[in-house]
Regions:
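Conserved ATP-binding module of the ATP-grasp superfamily
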Residues: 10-12, 33-36, 47-82, 97, ...
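Peripheral (often C-terminal) accessory segments that flank ATP-dependent C-N-forming ligase machineries
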Residues: 188-271
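Conserved N-proximal alpha/beta basic substrate-recognition cap immediately N-terminal to
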Residues: 1-28, 255-257, 262-263
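Conserved A3 ("GATE") glycine/threonine-rich loop of ANL adenylate-forming enzymes
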Residues: 41-45
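Short beta-strand-to-turn element immediately C-terminal to the catalytic PLP-Schiff-base lysine
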Residues: 17, 47-52, 86-88, 120, ...
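The start of beta-strands in P-loop NTPase/AAA+ ATPase cores
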Residues: 32, 68-69, 145, 159
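Short loop-to-beta-strand entry elements in the cores of soluble alpha/beta enzymes
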Residues: 146-150, 217-219
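ATP-dependent carboxylate/phosphate-activation module, predominantly the ATP-grasp catalytic core
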Residues: 54, 74-80, 84-142, 146, ...
Length: 271
């Protein structure tokens, strides 16, 4: 976060949870609510929304020595996007931009259906995020392998803020969505890239498709939910996991993907 900030890339105000005086200065300067986030972990695991200073200090004292593994961040209401990329010798050779239906933090705290859907590269938000993602990767000196980055578009001013990045493939079946819409299996390509590098060979990305797609995942009331009723021809993948429901829809028609995502999200909520 500090490296990205020093590169002039916009991001929410933050403070490491180490020095108590610095934390107090942050809480006096940045109005609540805040977000207390693990510096490790994946997705929205372990993230706490903090309403006021009393609640913050309760969490910090409760964490004890583990508090230093957290970062305190300004809460920015907005729409959250993710950028999944593959970088070779410092050059981003593959990038895919998607937008979450609801921010993962909201889904993990309040429940509901987790959804995300791809954006075409011609979309203005995608264009802005491809550029911003490249700036983040360059600032961090990442030269080799996959990245999964998240950004938020502020409701207040419509500007993008960098949230976080990890040098790994995205979780929560995001890699399955990327594979279904582009033909690029990020896990397999990461392995191929490592093998080519170890052998001193040149890595070549496979042909990339540019389809539209959406992913839906949620907890299920049934032990093994019946997914056969979700039978649109655009459904290309279904989750087979106890107490879970999930699927991916893919089409050349962006509006068809959005209509199916909305319809199936409503049905997931009822079923």
């Amino acid at each position: 976060r500090q490296v990205v900030a020093s590169a002039g890339i916009r991001e929410p105000n933050f403070a490491p949870v180490i020095n108590h005086d610095a934390i107090r200065e942050f809480t006096e300067r940045v109005p609540a609510p805040w977000v207390l986030k693990p510096r490790l972990e994946a997705g929205a695991m372990g993230i706490k929304r903090v309403a006021n200073s009393d609640e913050l200090w309760h969490f910090i004292h409760e964490l004890g020595d583990q508090a230093s593994f957290r970062v305190l961040e300004q809460y920015v209401p907005g729409d959250v996007y993710h950028v999944d990329a593959l970088t070779v010798h410092g050059e981003t050779i593959f990038v895919n931009v998607s937008r979450y239906g609801r921010p993962p933090l909201n889904v993990s705290h309040d429940g509901g259906v987790f959804t995300t859907y791809t954006l075409p590269h011609s979309d203005p938000d995608a264009e802005a995020l491809i550029k911003m993602n490249r700036q983040v990767i360059e600032a961090l000196g990442h030269r080799h392998g996959p990245t999964h980055a998240e950004f938020i578009k502020s409701h207040a001013d419509g500007e993008f803020n960098f949230l976080e990045i990890a040098a790994r493939v995205g979780g929560a079946h995001i890699a399955d969505l990327v594979g279904a819409t582009t033909g690029v299996n990020l896990w397999a390509e990461w392995a191929r890239l490592e093998i080519a590098t170890a052998r001193g060979e040149q890595y070549h990305l496979p042909p990339v498709k540019h389809l539209n797609g959406g992913l839906l995942v949620c907890l299920a009331r049934q032990q093994w939910p019946d997914m056969s009723v979700y039978d649109a021809p655009e459904v290309v993948w279904k989750m087979h996991k106890e107490q879970h429901a999930g699927l991916i829809v893919v089409s050349e028609d962006r509006s068809r993907v959005e209509n199916l995502r909305q319809e199936y999200m409503d049905r997931f909520s009822r079923d």
